Amino acid sequence: MNHHRIWQTVLLIPQGRVAGYGQVADLAGLPGRARMVGKALGEAPAELEIPWHRVLRSGGQIAFPAGSDKAAQQKGRLQEEGVAVLNNRVKMAEFQWWPDLATLLLMEY
């Protein structure tokens, strides 16, 4: 059930925007469960097409080790969406997603 809540929240992040693991946990009603977000994203069925690449560490860093295939894949996907990535980091002040109240109220779990 919690994984489903996380997946639903990540599906709401629009192209060109990012969110932190902790932010996703909070929005999914799971405060303090940032690590659960990472686990849920790793276990998401491929057919759900969860935009996992839009979820970053709170400081805007890509969580995968620099130089790894996953880090390169995440960076590439973000750049394709117009998100600037420099030194495996995104300026959260510029690209962070802040859902409006209507989005939050209409979230279904």
Regions found by a protein language model. Give the residues of each.
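Nucleic acid-binding interface residues in structured DNA/RNA-binding domains
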Residues: 1-109
